[in-house]
Amino acid sequence: IQLARGKYVWIAEADDLADVHFLEECVRWAEQQPDTAFCYVGSQIIDEEGQVSAKDINHWGGRAKREANIFPGKAFAEHNLYWRNYTLNASGVLFRRTYALTLVQSPFLTMRYCGDWMFWFQMALQGSVVEIYRNLNFFRQHPAKVTVSSQAEGRGVNEDIQILAFMESQLPPLATYKKRLRRGLLYKKIGRKPMSHSSKIALFDRMDAELGSSRADYWLMVSNQLLRWIFPNLLTRGRDRLK
């Protein structure tokens, strides 16, 4: 990134594919705002043979009826990235070089599994974010890929905890219910990992120490999953996501 000379940077990962219109569309939309931090497109998974999966990994819902959306970056960080990393693949993103260069001391540089999530969060705090509702990126998924193996072994959860703590330190004060719901979702994620009981306990202890979380947050999340069908205005991850 430091050696790049252009206004925007695209990390063209050798194993992934891009539609011929990817850069054209990203630049067109990025140029509509003077402070665009990054612009990302929809992704589809392809296997080792190049076969495209029918699985929907974007979860746009009704948003897909539009061509694109431009969001204030801080709102995108609070309502979208706080819940999960919606920028599924770095090769499907075009980002502003000057903003990225402000992050040379960022904690994401020491992360192995979730550093991209931290990077996009910090980028969003600096300017607008563009979502383009077209699948212009093709994400090759190998069974032995680092992201797949780390999910299977739960090694990335420590970084999840670190990122959540960082986000909460950077965002405006969040509602207690929202923070507890988010922590409950992470509690659920840990519980489902194929890890030893002692490893899970260690992660729960770290959540308690760094986030002030407890098993009560898990049960709040469970009740939220049930009550959302009764109360249409109840906060959920999907409802908090910017439209």
Region spans (language model):
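Conserved nucleotide-sugar donor-binding catalytic segment
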Residues: 60-156, 160
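Short aromatic/hydrophobic "clamp" motif used to bind/position activated sugar donors
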Residues: 9
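Short, conserved alpha-helix that lines the donor NDP-sugar binding/gating region
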Residues: 1-2
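Membrane-interface aromatic/basic loop that binds lipid-linked glycans or pyrophosphate carriers
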Residues: 169-170, 189-243
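C-terminal, non-catalytic tails of nucleotide-sugar-dependent glycosyltransferases
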Residues: 66-76, 128, 157-183, 209-213
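Conserved donor NDP-sugar-binding/catalytic core segment of glycosyltransferases
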Residues: 21-60
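Short glycine/serine/threonine-enriched helix-capping/active-site loop
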Residues: 6, 38-43, 132-134, 139
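The conserved acidic donor/metal-binding loop of glycosyltransferases
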Residues: 13-17, 42
